[in-house]
């Protein structure tokens, strides 16, 4: 239990360092979200099929109640009842189409989770970032209940409950509850709860925010209060 607490504190500190420009402290939001005894109550599960590479590594991590499929690596992380689906990862020899480029994939793609805390989070699809074709990474990140990370490498971010990051590389961002972001890339932003933002550069930019007073009737997340 002591090691779990040390790892938990380490992850919080790393996320806070990444979010320092927002003056955002994740600690009050994540304390007591998951009782510590539940983190040691459940097993982790790894799926084996004849169609996906058998490659799973985890080190200094807790995988309580989480499911994994495909090529995955977890380091210094806490996962609680999360689904890490590697069934759509790119394979060595594939060609990735990006704009006018056809980029060859040099190795089987891997989901890499490092220094992160994922709570009931779904991670699936594959990295759509042409700069990281073989690595679908989630680093120094905390995601809360029912977050959906769809083909989106993430570094140094905090994701509120019921938020979705879709086909977007994200660095050093805060994503409010019940938000949907599909913009290709976002950096150093604090996105309000209930935001729907879809952008294709030079094509369109759609932005909508649910009224907070109405949103709070359905999903409310604040310091010290579980969603």
Model-derived regions: residue spans:
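Terminal amphipathic alpha-helical/low-complexity segments used for targeting or macromolecular assembly
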Residues: 1-139, 146, 151-153, 162, ...
């Amino acid at each position: 239990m002591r090691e779990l607490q040390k790892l938990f504190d380490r992850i919080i500190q790393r996320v806070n360092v990444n979010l320092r420009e927002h003056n955002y402290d994740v600690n009050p939001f994540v304390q007591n979200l998951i009782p510590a005894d539940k983190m040691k109550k459940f097993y982790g599960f790894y799926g084996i099929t004849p169609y996906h590479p058998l490659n799973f590594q985890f080190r200094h991590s807790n995988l309580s109640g989480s499911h994994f499929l495909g090529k995955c690596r977890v380091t210094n992380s806490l996962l609680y009842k999360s689904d890490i689906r590697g069934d759509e990862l790119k394979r060595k020899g594939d060609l990735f189409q990006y704009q006018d480029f056809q980029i060859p994939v040099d190795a089987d793609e891997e989901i890499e989770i490092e220094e992160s805390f994922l709570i009931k989070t779904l991670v699936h699809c594959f990295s759509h970032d042409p700069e990281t074709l073989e690595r679908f990474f989630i680093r120094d990140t905390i995601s809360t209940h029912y977050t959906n990370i769809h083909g989106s490498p993430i570094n140094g971010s905090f994701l509120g409950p019921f938020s979705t990051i879709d086909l977007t590389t994200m660095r050093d961002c805060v994503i409010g509850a019940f938000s949907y972001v599909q913009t290709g890339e976002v950096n150093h932003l604090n996105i309000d709860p209930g935001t729907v933002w879809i952008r294709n550069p030079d094509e369109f930019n759609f932005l909508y925010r649910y009224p907070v007073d109405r949103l709070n009737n359905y999903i409310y997340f604040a310091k010290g209060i579980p969603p």
